[in-house]
Swiss-Prot record:
Keywords: Amino-acid biosynthesis, Cytoplasm, Histidine biosynthesis, Isomerase. SUPFAM superfamilies: Ribulose-phoshate binding barrel (SSF51366). It comes from the Bacteria. Belongs to the HisA/HisF family. CDD domains: HisA. It comes from Methylococcus capsulatus (strain ATCC 33009 / NCIMB 11132 / Bath). InterPro entries: Aldolase_TIM, His_biosynth, HisA_bact_arch, Isoase_HisA-like, Isoase_HisA-like_bact, RibuloseP-bd_barrel. This is 1-(5-phosphoribosyl)-5-[(5-phosphoribosylamino)methylideneamino] imidazole-4-carboxamide isomerase. Pathway: Amino-acid biosynthesis; L-histidine biosynthesis; L-histidine from 5-phospho-alpha-D-ribose 1-diphosphate: step 4/9. NCBIfam families: 1-(5-phosphoribosyl)-5-[(5-phosphoribosylamino)methylideneamino]imidazole-4-carboxamide isomerase (TIGR00007), PRK13585.1 (NF010112).
Amino acid sequence: MLLIPAIDLKDGKCVRLRQGRMEDDTVFSDDPVAVAGRWVAAGARRLHLVDLDGAFAGKPRNAETIHAIREACPDVEIQVGGGIRDEETIQGYLNAGVDFVIIGTKAVSAPHFVSDVTAEFPNHIIIGLDARDGKVAIDGWSKLSHHDVIDLAQKFEADGVEAIIYTDISRDGMMGGVNIEATSRLARAIHIPVIASGGITTIDDIKALGEIVGDGVIGAITGRAIYEGTLDFAEGLKLAETF
């Protein structure tokens, strides 16, 4: 199982939000490139980069920083989300060497977009489904849609996406533990990989996710916990790789 460190970018800095609220942020570093290098040195095989400003603006705002991280960390996979709502943005990131682009809001608001971009950019499209109580949130989590998370995941699987990143937004940034039941339910409902996100706080969460690897969970994204020290990244990675 992959353990994927999250680097959330706001105004060129590495931050974490609580439950997606832009006004409730904690700045962890003014140098996201150095942060990325730290996680790679600790053994990370993939990085999860989020352009938070882009997620709210609807277009990239931290692309320069993302490109710099790609150049500084050439030997790991990079997945990028936040503000990816057109083919031009996807092409730009792929040209810069990004491995996977994550589509969130646009996948929900314009479902045909997913089938178009999976055809145009096969093997590079991941869908980020952020949900509260089984319903999908959009626009940087500021709106809750009527869409059921499993129904949408099954549709995107049929469209040919690479994987689903599932975030339980009631848990994200709250250090409350991962929602194993909801993650397992989604993973069992589809045949493409699921990456868990939101609430991964301690080594116990890695153990719990390891028990549902057989359901189709291939990785876990962790953010606040590795910055605040409730999860030692190297220790968590070592455990994750046993699953």
